[in-house]
Structures are given as structure tokens and as C-alpha cells.
UniProtKB/Swiss-Prot annotation:
Protein task: DNA ligase that catalyzes the formation of phosphodiester linkages between 5'-phosphoryl and 3'-hydroxyl groups in double-stranded DNA using NAD as a coenzyme and as the energy source for the reaction. It is essential for DNA replication and repair of damaged DNA.
Gene name in the database record: ligA
One Gene Ontology cellular component annotation held by this UniProt entry: cytosol
Reaction(s) this enzyme catalyzes, per UniProt: NAD(+) + (deoxyribonucleotide)n-3'-hydroxyl + 5'-phospho-(deoxyribonucleotide)m = (deoxyribonucleotide)n+m + AMP + beta-nicotinamide D-nucleotide
PANTHER family, A to Z: CHROMOSOME TRANSMISSION FIDELITY FACTOR 18 (PTHR23389), DNA LIGASE (PTHR23389:SF9)
UniProt keyword list: DNA damage, DNA repair, DNA replication, Ligase, Magnesium, Manganese, Metal-binding, NAD, Zinc
Residues that coordinate or bind Zn(2+): C440, C443, C458, C464
GO MF annotations, alphabetized: DNA binding; DNA ligase (NAD+) activity; metal ion binding
Annotated protein name in UniProt: DNA ligase
Active-site residues, as the UniProt record annotates them: K148
Positions of NAD(+) binding: D52, A53, E54, Y55, D56, S101, L102, E146, R169, E205, K322, K346
Listed InterPro entries: BRCT_dom (IPR001357), BRCT_dom_sf (IPR036420), DisA/LigA_HHH (IPR041663), DNA_ligase (IPR001679), DNA_ligase_AS (IPR018239), DNA_ligase_CS (IPR033136), DNAligase_adenylation (IPR013839), DNAligase_N (IPR013840)
Tagged with keyword Magnesium: yes
Cofactor: Mg(2+); Mn(2+)
Length: 709
């Protein structure tokens, strides 16, 4: 700890009121500097150095001192973010430098044409139409590439380093003055760091991180208030509140990406240097950006971000390309209220509107009855969508979805399409409300809904063909028994024709019977029989997972296998014994005990054993902390000898948690070849990075042996 920090700590021990005026002024100045520094490390560097409780203590002390000494309070103090009295309306603001929109590109050809126009405008020899990167290295145009955030465009005006005005984009010429609201956003500095220009107008985006959006909606729902459709709507609605105290409670963030008016300093030579300058002044700047040359560089950036889009912590709807040299931007100029030097390359829309033509119910593996909206076909998220999940009856009531409604449908990545909201003003007069059936549409069994559950279930069990089909598909999946070639259509035929009723029946199948089925030939039938035969040798944890016990996923199956060692011991365990297993609580214990108490399930297990399904067994392991218990790992890149799944199994077997993204709570990142942004973030946060050898050495040091396969 430095002398400065030691002195500050000593002063902190004295009550605020006990400090004389000079000491209070000194302490207030130090507290503001510390809070600004912590905000910079958190919002700009994404590398917080103190826990939230310590930050809150510093903030509370500053607030107490300012109350005790009101003459020390200043507009740029961190305490002034809480929001003042409500406004009657927002004033209009005329932008000194217009906030122009960008032209859009939706296809590669649009990008090639953009690059060609830029090259020609700068007097360079352009390639022929439809060809990319035929320039020499010297002739290729250099571009700055960044993300196109799905939020609300904002202009921040700083004078002598202090925030004096914030305005929305509006029509590009005139926006709304939202300064009082923007001052509540912790990511936006009220005072810039270092030597700030006399006037600096920063353009950027106010948005909401997905994690913060989810928490906000959870709070809204808990309070019985309206939830938001998406983070963009939440950000826009929060920023345009007439009561800034409401805005202060909303988790808004900000990224800077452009420059308006500038006085007192020379403009930087390039757009990328400008962004680096913003970060040095304490403004948050997105790290997912690059400088590339030529059209191929632009397309490579677009594809790289497209692959990672669903893993980003915020919503984007495309990427933006800008000629990097500011002097070249000026040469290219503007056309039709848009810059010639910039282009927005859009991703396929993740939200679209369409019409609900019907609402049907599907029956899942555990009997769950899921309402599904049958939609008028719509292209969203890169595919044509005709169905969307409605989750459960309560969700339909909450969203007020009727047959005939126009709805907003969202599809992101591999996520199942869902209806996120109804466009109420477009509801037709003949719209029909959904009524949950009382009997299963597949087997006719009674549908029941327990008081403490949101999901209704068919009570038919394996009598229900729909549940049998889903159970067989689960049993055969790669992470369970790994029976390659057993897909939906084949399972449909096997169940509908009465050939297979339980998983054990799969091991009785022969080539002749399979080859007689639709779309099956001798070769594909032989391949499937071979895959079924191969699956006889498995592991205990895979077998447990394959059984489809409710609430038992892969991780719990591994814990059960390690704890009991033998399947018979697990089957004989009562709820009290099951509660001795790591991470098994009362609900899971009850579900497991109930499953093995069902005679039909025991009979199927014995049939599977009789069919030759086997696995190595071991002695029970007493409940004790695993060597890496409590540690969080993130895997990125390609490891030299282990697949990512193998590495994950080794770490989980040692008690570690394997997460999908890097945060300040991550203990280690294991990086292989072609590691991407996760490695960059780990290095920025100071998270230890291991290669495969380092991970194996850590496992060996912890006494964790590789899991048997």
C-alpha cells in the first residue's frame, strides 16, 4: 500500500463531522479522485480493482462529507449522479456538428462497391467490379472497423474537461437535452482525465448490457411492472424519463465512437488514434475493433464478429467501417446526408414482426406441455421461422398472446425463436385467446399442473408416444449414449410402428428391420446397428445422464457417478443419502429417488444391462471438497491434444466450474491455438492464462486424475 493510501485510510477512520474544513476539502478531493479512478478501471479498462463494498464505502463517505460541508459540493462530483427533480419536458438542442446516419450494406457486393468508391475518391487505382483486394499494399485503403451497437445515439459536450451537455441524435440536426439523465450514468465521466481540450464533443451509444437488462426485467416483473422487449427499448425508455431519479436506477452504459466539435487541440491523424485518445481521457471505448486494409479485411472483420455475435455481452446489429485517416475522410466528404467514408454492414435482423396463425402444444421428454405459436413464415436471424416457443400458459397470459395477433419474434444464434411481445394496436376483432387443453393431445392422458410449478405436464409417462420419442432422442444424443444416426425421423417411425417402446429395444434392432423403414438402405441400417453396438461400452455418468432423470444434467450425473461408484448403490440410495452428493439439493434428490422407485424404470435398466450395456465401476467416494472446488475456468482456442469437451470433463471432475465467458470472477483461462477475444479480456483483467500443459500440471498438482472413459 502506498503512503498516499495509508494516509487516506487513517483519515477515513475519523467521522466526517470531526474533520476541520481544510482536512475535509483535502479528503473530498482524494475521495473524488479515487472514485473517478475506480470508475475508469471498471468502465473503461474493464478491470475493477476493488470490491463493490469498498467502492460503496468510499461513495458513502464522500456523500456524508458533502452534506457536512455543502460548500465543497461540485456539479462533477460522483455523488451528483443520483438524479434531481422531474422535468416537464426536454429542451431542444441544435447540434453544432450534425449527427448524420450511415448508408447500409447487406451483402458482400455492397462492401466491395464501398471500397471501390473510397479508392476512386482518393485517386487510387480501383479493382474491377466484383473483385476484392486487387490493390497493391500501398494502394489499399486503410479502414477502422468497429461494432454497430443497438442502443441510442448520444452526443456529449465537454468544456474544459467537464460534462456540460448531453443530447440525443433526434433528426441529426436537432436533438433533446437529456443532460440531467446522462449525468446519472456511471460509465460516463462527469470530468475527463488528464489534459482535456477546451471543447470536446463525443459521439457514442447509450446501451444496456444483456446481464443488466435481464436483472432489470426480473426486478420489473417482481414489482408487477411492465417488462421491456429488448435492451435497446430499455435503454431508450430509461434515458428519456422525465424523472432522472428513475434513470439513475436503470443500469445504462456507454461506448464512445465518434467526434463532433473539437477546440483547443489538433485533431488526431486517424479514427483509431481518436478512439485511443477517448480511452485516455476516461471515456469507455469498445475493445472489439480493428484496423484493416481493403475490402477483404472488412469482410473478414464482419465474419469474425458474426461468429462471436451471440457471445458478446451486448446487442449489436452490424459492424461499421470508416476510412481511418481523418484527412482522407475530409477528402471523401458527404453525399445525401451520409458520409462517403463510412458504411454500416448490417447482420440479418434478429427481431421481426409476423402473425400468430395458431397456438398448439408440444409434449416433451418429461411430459412438459409447451405452447408453440405457429407463425406466418418470416425471415429472422438468418433463417425462415414458422414456429416460436411461448414457454408456458403463464407466459402466454403475461404477454397476452392471441391467435391472430401481430407479434415481435426474436431469434438469436441457435436460440429457439420466441415471441417477445404483442403489437396490441394491430389485434384483429376476431383474435382468439389460448385455452390450455385438459388432456394430452398425443395420448389423451390427463394434464396436471402442480401449484409450485409454471409448467403443465402430461401424466401418461411412457404410455405417451411423444414422451417416448423425446426420451429415445435424449438417450441417443452425443453426450449420453452417443448413437450416431438415430435422428428425429427414424425415431418417429420406430415409435409409431411399435418397433421400439423403451431404450432397451434399440439393442434388439437388426439390419433387415431397419432397412425396411422409409429412407433407410442396407448401408445406413448397418451403420446404425454398428453405432448401437458401439454404445454398449459407456461410462456410468453418461448412462445416468442418458436415463433422462428429471433435474439431472451432465454435471449432476458426473457427481452421482463419482459419489456412488456403482449404479446399484445409486439405485438403492434414499433421499438422505442422495443429499450427501455434492450440489444435490432436496428437489433433485426427490426426483432421483422417485425415478428409481418406479418399477418400470428399474425393469428398463435391467433390460439394458442384459443387452450388454456396461461401464467401469469404482468404489464410492466420500463427500469431500474436490481439489479445484470453487475455481472457475474458461476454455478458448484449440488445444493440441484434448478436445474442449475432454478438457471440460477433466476440470469438472476436479470440482471446477467451466464458464463460457471471462469476468473478474474467472480464476484461470485455458488458451489454445487461435484463441480470440476471451484471451484478450483475460489479459486485460489480469486473469492467469494456462496452456494445455499448464492445465494438466495444475490438475496433477491438485491430485486430480483424468476421468475414466
Amino acid at each position: 500500500m502506498t503512503a498516499k493510501h495509508r494516509g487516506a485510510q487513517a483519515e477515513a477512520s475519523a467521522p466526517a463531522g470531526a474533520l476541520p474544513a481544510d482536512a475535509a476539502a483535502s479528503r473530498v478531493a482524494w475521495l473524488r479522485e479515487e472514485l473517478d479512478r475506480h470508475n475508469y478501471q471498471y468502465y473503461v479498462l474493464d478491470a475493477p480493482t476493488v470490491p463493490d463494498a469498498e467502492y460503496d464505502a468510499l461513495f458513502s463517505e464522500l456523500m456524508a462529507l458533502e452534506l457536512e460541508h455543502p460548500e465543497l459540493q461540485t456539479p462533477d462530483s460522483p455523488t451528483q449522479r443520483v438524479g434531481g427533480e422531474p422535468l416537464s419536458a426536454f429542451d431542444s438542442v441544435r447540434h453544432r456538428v450534425p449527427m448524420l446516419s450511415l448508408n447500409n450494406a447487406f451483402a458482400d457486393e455492397d462492401v466491395l462497391n464501398f471500397d471501390r468508391r473510397c479508392a476512386q475518391g482518393l485517386g487510387r487505382t480501383a479493382p474491377a467490379a466484383g473483385e476484392a483486394d486487387l490493390f497493391s499494399a500501398a494502394d489499399a485503403v486503410e479502414y477502422a472497423c468497429e461494432l454497430k451497437f443497438d442502443g441510442l445515439a448520444m452526443s456529449l459536450r465537454y468544456e474544459d474537461g467537464r460534462l456540460v451537455q448531453a443530447a440525443t441524435r433526434g433528426d441529426g440536426e436537432t436533438g433533446e437535452d437529456v443532460t440531467v439523465n446522462v449525468r446519472t450514468i456511471k460509465a460516463i465521466p462527469l470530468k475527463l482525465r488528464g489534459q482535456a481540450p477546451a471543447v470536446l464533443e463525443v459521439r457514442g451509444e447509450v446501451f444496456m448490457f444483456r446481464r443488466d437488462f435481464d436483472k432489470l426485467n426480473a426486478r420489473q416483473a417482481e414489482a408487477g411492472e411492465k417488462t421491456f422487449v429488448n435492451p435497446r427499448n430499455a435503454a431508450a425508455g430509461s434515458l428519456r424519463q422525465l424523472d432522472p431519479r428513475i434513470t439513475a436506477r436503470r443500469p445504462l452504459s456507454f461506448f464512445a465512437y465518434g467526434l463532433g466539435e473539437l477546440q483547443g487541440v489538433e485533431r488526431p491523424p486517424t479514427h483509431s488514434a481518436m478512439l485511443d485518445g477517448f480511452a485516455a481521457l476516461g471515456l469507455p471505448v469498445c475493445k472489439d475493433r480493428a484496423v484493416v486494409k481493403g475490402a477483404q479485411g472488412l469482410l473478414d472483420f464482419y465474419r469474425d464478429i458474426g461468429k462471436r455475435r451471440d457471445d458478446l455481452p451486448y446487442d449489436i446489429d452490424g459492424v461499421v467501417y470508416k476510412v481511418n485517416a481523418l484527412a482522407e475522410q475530409e477528402r471523401l466528404g458527404f453525399v445525401s446526408r451520409a458520409p462517403r467514408f463510412a458504411l454500416a454492414h448490417k447482420f440479418p435482423a434478429q427481431e421481426m414482426t409476423t402473425v400468430v396463425e395458431d397456438i398448439e402444444v408440444q409434449v416433451g421428454r418429461t411430459g412438459a406441455i409447451t405452447p408453440v405459436a405457429r407463425l406466418r413464415p418470416v425471415f429472422v436471424g438468418g433463417v425462415t421461422v414458422t414456429n416460436a416457443t411461448l414457454h408456458n400458459e403463464d407466459e402466454i397470459r403475461r404477454k397476452d398472446v392471441h391467435v391472430g395477433d401481430t407479434v415481435i419474434v426474436r431469434r438469436a444464434g441457435d436460440v429457439i425463436p420466441e415471441v417477445v411481445a404483442v403489437v396490441a394496436e394491430r389485434r384483429p376483432a376476431d383474435a382468439r385467446a389460448f385455452v390450455m387443453p385438459t388432456a394430452c393431445p398425443v395420448c389423451g392422458s390427463h394434464i396436471e399442473k402442480l401449484e409450485d410449478e409454471a409448467i403443465a405436464r402430461c401424466t401418461g409417462g411412457l404410455i405417451c408416444a411423444a414422451q417416448r420419442k423425446q426420451s429415445l432422442l435424449h438417450f441417443a444424443q452425443r453426450r449420453a449414449m452417443d448413437i450416431e444416426g438415430l435422428g428425429d425421423r427414424l425415431v418417429e417411425q420406430l415409435v409409431d410402428q411399435g418397433i421400439v417402446r423403451t431404450p432397451a429395444d434399440l439393442y434388439k434392432l437388426g439390419v433387415a428391420k431397419l432397412a425396411a423403414l422409409e429412407r433407410m438402405a442396407d448401408k445406413s441400417a448397418a451403420n446404425l446397428v454398428a453405432a448401437i453396438d458401439k454404445s454398449r461400452a459407456t461410462t456410468m455418468n453418461r448412462f445416468i445422464f442418458a436415463l433422462g432423470i428429471r433435474h439431472v444434467g451432465e454435471a449432476t450425473a458426473k457427481d452421482l457417478a463419482r459419489h456412488f461408484g456403482k449404479l446399484d448403490a445409486l439405485m438403492a440410495a434414499d433421499e438422505a443419502a442422495l443429499l450427501e452428493v455434492n450440489d444435490v439439493g432436496p428437489v433433485v434428490a426427490q426426483s432421483i429417488a422417485h425415478f428409481f422407485a418406479e418399477p418400470h424404470n428399474v425393469e428398463v435398466i435391467e433390460q439394458l444391462r442384459a443387452a450388454g450395456v456396461h461401464w467401469p465401476e469404482s468404489e464410492p467416494v466420500a463427500k469431500s471438497p474436490a481439489p479445484l472446488s470453487g475455481k472457475t475456468f474458461v476454455l478458448t482456442g484449440t488445444l493440441p491434444t484434448l478436445s474442449r469437451e475432454d478438457a471440460k470433463e477433466l476440470l469438472e471432475a476436479a470440482g471446477a466450474k467451466v464458464a463460457g465467458s471471462v469476468s473478474k470472477k474467472t480464476d484461470y483461462v485455458v488458451a489454445g491455438a487461435e484463441a480470440g477475444s476471451k484471451l484478450d479480456k483475460a489479459e486485460a483483467l489480469g486473469v492467469p492464462v494456462l496452456d494445455e500443459a499448464g492445465m494438466l500440471a495444475l490438475l496433477a498438482q491438485a491430485g486430480a486424475a483424468p476421468a475414466e472413459e
